[in-house]
Amino acid sequence: MTIRYPNGKRYDQASQPHKTPIKKHTYSNRGMSLEEELNDTNQYYLTHNIACVHKKPTPLQIVKVDYPARSAAVVKEAYFKQPSTTDYNGVYKGKYIDFEAKETKNKTSFPLQNFHLHQIEHMKQVVAHNGIAFVIIKFTLFDEFYLLDAKHIIAFWNRQNTGGRKSITKQEIEEHGSLLSCGYHPRIDYIRVLDTVYFS
């Protein structure tokens, strides 16, 4: 299947860095991707009527479909309708929340190239309208998760654009962000941090 960006450029999945989860055997949830862990967490929040948060679908425009059999359809070509914004959005305690989820195998920093300008602009707009915007960053080698408010991401992005470093150090994330506690259910309890950072 061929997928194209809105500008017509071809999306080549093979050239994208493939994130293979690191398999660890110390407890059962290690090795899950951040997306799987957050989807599991959000399902827990929804089931227990804590919050309503969902993964945003990626909008695609189907262009070419083959029908090898009457009951089967194979998409051969599709385009991204528009650049995606962030990964998740929803409502918690009457407030709109919107966040991006990112993973890195780096030990000491998080590269800002993992963000796109339209994602930064989207987070700015959410904050301007009194929504809550943040990023959850997973350091896969340590199995550590941090919640970092959008204002810090925006500041680090601006620093990069004025000749500063092109990454956020792990020390800066530890200083400005909040370490998330992990467990079985919910896997990544980011709501507890939201209560502390935004609702206290």
Swiss-Prot record:
<dbReference type="InterPro" id="IPR011856">
    <property type="entry name" value="tRNA_endonuc-like_dom_sf"/>
</dbReference>
<feature type="binding site">
    <location>
        <position position="85"/>
    </location>
    <ligand>
        <name>Mg(2+)</name>
    </ligand>
</feature>
<dbReference type="Pfam" id="PF03838">
    <property type="entry name" value="RecU"/>
</dbReference>
<dbReference type="GO" id="GO:0003676">
    <property type="term" value="F:nucleic acid binding"/>
</dbReference>
<dbReference type="InterPro" id="IPR004612">
    <property type="entry name" value="Resolv_RecU"/>
</dbReference>
<feature type="region of interest" description="Disordered">
    <location>
        <begin position="1"/>
        <end position="24"/>
    </location>
</feature>
<keyword id="KW-0255">Endonuclease</keyword>
<dbReference type="GO" id="GO:0005737">
    <property type="term" value="C:cytoplasm"/>
</dbReference>
<keyword id="KW-0378">Hydrolase</keyword>
<dbReference type="GO" id="GO:0006310">
    <property type="term" value="P:DNA recombination"/>
</dbReference>
<keyword id="KW-0963">Cytoplasm</keyword>
<keyword id="KW-0233">DNA recombination</keyword>
<protein>
    <recommendedName>
        <fullName>Holliday junction resolvase RecU</fullName>
        <ecNumber>3.1.21.10</ecNumber>
    </recommendedName>
</protein>
<feature type="site" description="Transition state stabilizer">
    <location>
        <position position="102"/>
    </location>
</feature>
<comment type="similarity">
    <text>Belongs to the RecU family.</text>
</comment>
<dbReference type="GO" id="GO:0004519">
    <property type="term" value="F:endonuclease activity"/>
</dbReference>
<dbReference type="GO" id="GO:0007059">
    <property type="term" value="P:chromosome segregation"/>
</dbReference>
<keyword id="KW-0460">Magnesium</keyword>
<dbReference type="GO" id="GO:0006281">
    <property type="term" value="P:DNA repair"/>
</dbReference>
<keyword id="KW-0540">Nuclease</keyword>
<keyword id="KW-0227">DNA damage</keyword>
<dbReference type="GO" id="GO:0000287">
    <property type="term" value="F:magnesium ion binding"/>
</dbReference>
<comment type="function">
    <text>Endonuclease that resolves Holliday junction intermediates in genetic recombination. Cleaves mobile four-strand junctions by introducing symmetrical nicks in paired strands. Promotes annealing of linear ssDNA with homologous dsDNA. Required for DNA repair, homologous recombination and chromosome segregation.</text>
</comment>
<feature type="binding site">
    <location>
        <position position="100"/>
    </location>
    <ligand>
        <name>Mg(2+)</name>
    </ligand>
</feature>
<feature type="binding site">
    <location>
        <position position="87"/>
    </location>
    <ligand>
        <name>Mg(2+)</name>
    </ligand>
</feature>
<feature type="binding site">
    <location>
        <position position="119"/>
    </location>
    <ligand>
        <name>Mg(2+)</name>
    </ligand>
</feature>
<keyword id="KW-0234">DNA repair</keyword>
<dbReference type="InterPro" id="IPR011335">
    <property type="entry name" value="Restrct_endonuc-II-like"/>
</dbReference>
<keyword id="KW-0479">Metal-binding</keyword>
